[in-house]
Amino acid sequence: MNSRTLKRISNVRLKARSELKLDEWQQHNYYYDKNLVGCTKDQLERIDARNTTREEFIEKYERPGKPVIIQHLIDDWPAFDKWTIEKLGKKYRNQRFKVGEDDDGKSVKLKMKYFLDYALNNRDDSPLYLFESSFGEHQKKKRLLDDYDVPEYFSEDLFHLVGEHRRPPYRWWCIGPQRSGTGIHIDPLGTSAWNGLISGHKRWCIFPPSTPRELLKPTSADAPRNKDEGITWFKVIYPRTQHHSWPKEYSCIEAIQHPGEVIFVPGGYWHVVLNMDLTVAVTQNFCSSVNFPNVWTRVIRSRPKMSKKFLERLKRRRPDLARLTEKIDINGDTGPRSDTSSSSSSSSSADSSPDSADESDTESKVTTIHERPFDQGDESFVKKQRVTPLS
């Protein structure tokens, strides 16, 4: 890193993770632990979008609540050409993007040119993670919206009824250096999520909604300062999940997401993500007719004002769902809440309100299990967030 980058990174580090001194960002030497980003299990089922219709996807995966990786769903995105590190560095060189939050919950931002220098050259244990939710509101950064389309499988977006400024944060554009990631979480408000990966590789561990929080969450005893970071989870909790004493009903589904693949995480699933190399991705949370009952119970509890506007719009645009709200038991057990401490869905950085707000972030029976080595040469050029989206 050049001297200008080092100066700015030091300032950002102190703001984004005030609990760490500058000389503690590399105290565990995770940069040298290649097991974290090396060979791992790849168990999650894959489907081919070229021979799977939207209706088939809904009936086989969304409705049953089954995580899956989808291939050839985003092959036509301009992002594959426009989101190379070189082109992003030129086009958005002086634009500032969110890489964390300070102790007051305010965004900590960094210019793209400094972040990319840092991303390619740092040796931090858990590097800063560019995780931007407001890119669609900025005159220059909103051009990113032209580079991708919401996949057909996830085209139903009921929260759009309440308006762009009233709805909770729901989309994140992210660049993750190797070893960055998001801590264990459930996505906010019962929403489901999809993550489209343009370059690099992501390591996922996904657990059933019924998995007890105390089994999955690192404690202060496990990690006094970095307990919410994705890499901490893989160092501390992951080995426990592989031990014979780990309850089989809470077994982990492991996956490696490759460039061009989309991962679908149904609402309620715990998930944790680690960037195995430099990654560029976009992720969105959504409410559809399928997950609406679970989302409604959480919205009416935690966002009462928005719920009134939502219901008002549903009566006009989706009277069938408006009638359904009268039958939903909002006091019933709707499963685990999302974590405000999740790190977007992502963690080295997320947004205050998903990757989780007052709920947590997310990611079974596996039909195929095989070992897939990760080729370090296949690298594509290429804090915890209050609201954690799908990393």
Protein language model features and the residues they cover:
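N-terminal accessory scaffold of Fe(II)-dependent oxygenases
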Residues: 1-262, 274-391
